[in-house]
Structure formats: structure tokens, C-alpha cells
């Protein structure tokens, strides 16, 4: 199982009526170029490693979106016994920005997103989360 203790815990924004799914870990993953990417991983209630998951949903948000927008979607997949992982793209949500203006989602090249995606796949998903891996994306 993935060791979350080696990473800085990251916050989620909730309201009284819009709560994060339970049984999750949200943290900042440090990329090779020293940027923080906010990542969330949720496990179905009662999950036991290698026994009670149907696989992993890799949920990839659209442009200018963030983890919190997908709480209901995450919960639907958890109810169906999938593990769910998602992250805020570089420059979005609570991930690091490439420029000083926190209100702008600028990246120099889309390759930066590709690199972040590949790091998360290689260092978190492939070695630690249940197969099969099912990718779901929106608007990128």
C-alpha cells in the first residue's frame, strides 16, 4: 500500500452541505522540477489491499477545474468498489502555479502536464493501486 506519511498533507475545501468522500488521503506530491501537485486517493469503505477493489479510476479534471468539483463523482465510484485517484493539474486548484498570479492557470508547454501525469502514473498508481486502471478525463 502507498505510504502517505512521506508527503505533506493537503487540504480539501468543504461546506456544510458539500463534503469530501470518506476514506481518502490528500497530499502534495513533489515533482522532479520541485513543484507541488495536490493529489487525492480514496478507497472504498472496507477496502483491504489486493482483495476488495474492482480496480482504480484515474479521474483527470478539465481545464481550470479542481478536486472538490468531483466529490460526487468520486463517491459514485467508491460506492461501486473502485479506488479513485485524482489530482489538480499544475497551475490549477491547490497545485503550484508557474507564475506569481494565483488567479491564472499558465503553463509554458502542455508537456508539463504530460510530465506530471507520467510521474503520478509511475510513482503512485502503477506500483501501489489496484488494477485494472481506468482513465476518465474531462475537457483537457
Can you say where each PLM-predicted feature lies in the sequence?
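Donor nucleotide-sugar binding loop of glycosyltransferases
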Residues: 35, 66
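Conserved Rossmann-like nucleotide-binding pocket used by diverse enzymes
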Residues: 59, 85, 136
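Conserved alpha/beta-hydrolase
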Residues: 67, 72-99
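Alpha/beta-hydrolase fold nucleophile elbow
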Residues: 128-139
Amino acid at each position: 500500500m502507498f505510504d502517505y506519511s512521506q508527503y505533506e498533507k493537503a487540504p480539501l475545501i468543504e461546506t456544510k452541505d458539500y463534503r469530501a468522500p470518506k476514506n481518502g488521503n490528500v497530499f502534495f506530491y513533489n515533482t522532479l522540477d520541485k513543484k507541488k501537485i495536490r493529489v487525492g486517493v480514496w478507497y472504498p469503505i472496507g477496502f483491504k489491499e489486493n482483495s476488495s477493489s474492482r480496480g482504480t479510476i484515474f479521474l483527470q479534471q478539465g481545464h481550470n477545474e479542481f478536486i472538490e468539483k468531483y466529490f460526487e463523482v468520486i463517491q459514485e465510484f467508491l460506492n461501486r468498489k473502485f479506488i479513485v485517484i485524482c489530482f489538480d493539474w499544475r497551475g490549477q486548484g491547490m497545485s503550484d502555479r508557474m507564475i506569481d498570479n494565483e488567479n491564472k492557470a499558465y503553463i509554458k508547454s502542455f508537456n508539463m502536464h504530460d510530465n506530471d501525469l507520467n510521474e503520478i502514473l509511475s510513482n503512485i498508481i502503477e506500483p501501489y493501486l489496484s488494477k485494472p486502471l481506468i482513465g476518465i478525463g474531462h475537457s483537457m
